[in-house]
Design a protein with these regions (language model features):
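Conserved beta-strand scaffold positions in the cores of enzyme catalytic domains, especially
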Residues: 30, 114-116, 137-142
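C-terminal "exit" segments of structured domains
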Residues: 140-186
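Von Willebrand factor
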Residues: 1-43, 47-89, 93-96, 120-130
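A general structural motif
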Residues: 25, 81-83, 111
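Short, hinge-like loop/turn segments at secondary-structure boundaries
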Residues: 46-49, 132-135, 159-160
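Short, ordered loop/turn segments at secondary-structure junctions
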Residues: 33, 119-120, 145-146
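VWA/integrin I-like adhesion module and closely mimicked acidic/polar interface patches used
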Residues: 92-135
Length: 186
């Protein structure tokens, strides 16, 4: 997403791993796009510090969204080994919503749930993000700019799901804020 959000994500990403330590950890791959036609994926990492190191090297650049490339990448990865979840944070969608929906349907058929967190209230993005979440069996949630802890809690809940399934997500829901409980309602 945009630079202020990226900086916040770098700061809070460690929370994702706290939920997973008791369940054997979580492998994470950073996929990002920026600028003109640049979309990159890191190697898979297990340690929170390794992900922070990868994220701090990324600089934001203006450019169109490349959500289709991210979804295609997730599908390719899921063909090689199970991918439990894709977390996407964004504020707009400048792509063909029907094409994204088709890819999301393929992801859902492979068991890859997308948890899509939306900044702002762009109606095209809302439709695209809601459809992606629904077709994958994941969740769409609008982020509030008033709560600095919200993204941390939501990412922790998604990490719990990825590491321990629906039961772990339900456990996280019992312990956390109402917004986290919304993840199980999609």
């Amino acid at each position: 997403s945009r630079e202020p959000s990226w900086d916040r994500a770098v700061q809070v990403q460690g929370q994702m791993f706290l939920e997973t330590q008791a369940k054997g950890g979580l492998d994470v791959q950073l996929v990002y796009f920026r600028g003109f036609d640049e979309c990159r994926a890191s190697k898979w990492v297990r340690e929170p510090r390794a992900l922070v190191d990868l994220m701090t090297k990324v600089m934001c650049r203006a450019g169109r969204t490349q959500i289709e490339r991210v979804l295609n990448h997730a599908l390719r990865q899921a063909k090689e080994a199970p991918v439990d979840a894709l977390v996407y944070v964004g504020d707009c969608c400048e792509e063909d919503v029907d094409r994204l929906g088709h890819l999301a349907g393929q992801m859902g058929a492979r068991g890859v749930r997308a948890f899509v967190f939306q900044e702002g209230d762009d109606p095209v993005a809302s439709r695209a993000f809601r459809d992606i979440a629904k077709l994958t069996g994941g969740a769409h949630c609008r982020l509030s700019s008033t709560s600095p802890d919200e993204l941390r809690q939501l990412l922790g809940a998604v990490a719990a799901y990825a590491a321990g399934g629906v039961a772990a997500l339900e456990d996280a829901n019992r312990r956390q804020a109402h917004r986290v409980r919304l993840l199980t309602k999609s």
